[in-house]
Amino acid sequence: MKSHYRLPGILAAAAATLVTSGIADASASAPDSKPGPSGATAYGWVRNANSAHCLAVPGGSTENGIGLIQWGCGSWRDHYWQFEYAFNSGGRNYYRLRNLNSQQCLAVPGASTTPGTQVIQWPCGTWKDHYWGIEYTNRGTRLVNWNSGQCLAIPGASRVQGEKAIQWPCGTWADHYWNI
């Protein structure tokens, strides 16, 4: 007959469940750090829709400033990236892409706006070239650099392993689309 004493305990347990599940989280309005159903701590491939190769760090290097490439997708740690939500601008969500192996971010060297500049990994910061917007189109998903306004691409729509990843003015070329 002590059920009225259990109610506060039940309510406290329910509230704790809501908070730990993220349902009552104050930041619930911000999207997951990785777009899609994978969740906030998920790392996944950034796979080029044209070549089916993944954005990778050559040799799994942890060196600052190393140029990024495409490579056949595998279980290597340097093939996995986390999307960390940063902000929304002009209706587009922007993220930092953090590499699982090096813990460095996808960046454009020196905040260059020159088409064809190879993208690099660099210690994550708040520089404009570290943020990438997700642009959903009827042809697929593009990653657009906040600083340059250019897309992550593979030159000449190459399907060769080891081809560099670059920024290029956004277009409808097949190598501008990524599966994330």
Regions found by a protein language model. Give the residues of each.
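Intrinsic disorder/low-complexity signature
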Residues: 1, 22, 29, 45, ...
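Secretory targeting and sorting signals
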Residues: 1-30
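Low-complexity intrinsically disordered segments
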Residues: 14-17, 38, 114, 123
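Extracellular glycan-recognition/adhesion modules and their associated mucin-like linkers
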Residues: 31-62, 80-113, 131-159, 177-180
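Short, tandemly repeated low-complexity microdomains enriched for cysteine and small residues
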Residues: 62-83, 112-130, 159-172, 176
